[in-house]
UniProtKB/Swiss-Prot annotation:
Gene3D superfamilies: Ribosomal protein S7 domain. This is Small ribosomal subunit protein uS7c. InterPro entries: Ribosomal_uS7 (IPR000235), Ribosomal_uS7_bac/org-type (IPR005717), Ribosomal_uS7_CS (IPR020606), Ribosomal_uS7_dom (IPR023798), Ribosomal_uS7_dom_sf (IPR036823). One of its GO terms (cellular component) is chloroplast. It comes from Trochodendron aralioides (Wheel tree). SUPFAM superfamilies: Ribosomal protein S7. The lineage of its organism: Eukaryota, Viridiplantae, Streptophyta, Embryophyta, Tracheophyta. Belongs to the universal ribosomal protein uS7 family. It comes from the Eukaryota.
Length: 155
């Protein structure tokens, strides 16, 4: 048994312009090489592009996209008796949001396009509508969990 206690969950601080935690979470995940100001620029440009494309509140589009991509269950590899099984596990809201943001950014980076702000805005709009690579990833994860339902008792 480990002697260490469990780490306290840190709550993300709100960003300076929109006062939104999701924006801060996105900024911290998009961050590369410690260039936080560049990460903020990318996010804010993407939010402006969403505003222009949809002509609605861009934060509601962001919230809707993240809610649409957030998985309920996932599979975890578990070694039982010499063979590895994919065991379906339920995911908490914080971990689900983190996964959703990671998938959205991954799908955005894979997209063809001019710059990251453009690609991110396109992916967020698609995810809010219920299409896009990130949504496909969520559905694939749910399918995997459903297929391996027989191993749920290994939790």
């Amino acid at each position: 048994m480990s002697r260490r206690g469990t780490a306290e969950e840190k709550t993300a601080k709100s960003d300076p312009i929109y006062r939104n935690r999701l924006v801060t979470m996105l900024v911290n995940r998009i961050l590369k090489h410690g260039k936080k100001s560049l990460a903020y620029q990318i996010i804010y440009r993407a939010v402006k592009k969403i505003q222009q494309k949809t002509e609605t509140n861009p934060l509601s589009v962001l919230r809707q996209a993240i809610r649409g991509v957030t998985p309920d269950i996932a599979v975890k590899a578990r070694r039982v008796g010499g063979s590895t099984h994919q065991v379906p596990i339920e995911i908490g809201s914080t971990q689900g949001k983190a996964l959703a943001i990671r998938w959205l950014l991954g799908a955005s980076r894979k997209r063809p396009g001019r710059n990251m702000a453009f690609k991110l805005s396109s992916e967020l709009v698609d995810a809010a509508k219920g299409s896009g690579d990130a949504i496909r990833k969520k559905e694939e994860t749910h399918r995997m969990a459903e297929a391996n339902r027989a191993f749920a008792h290994f939790r």
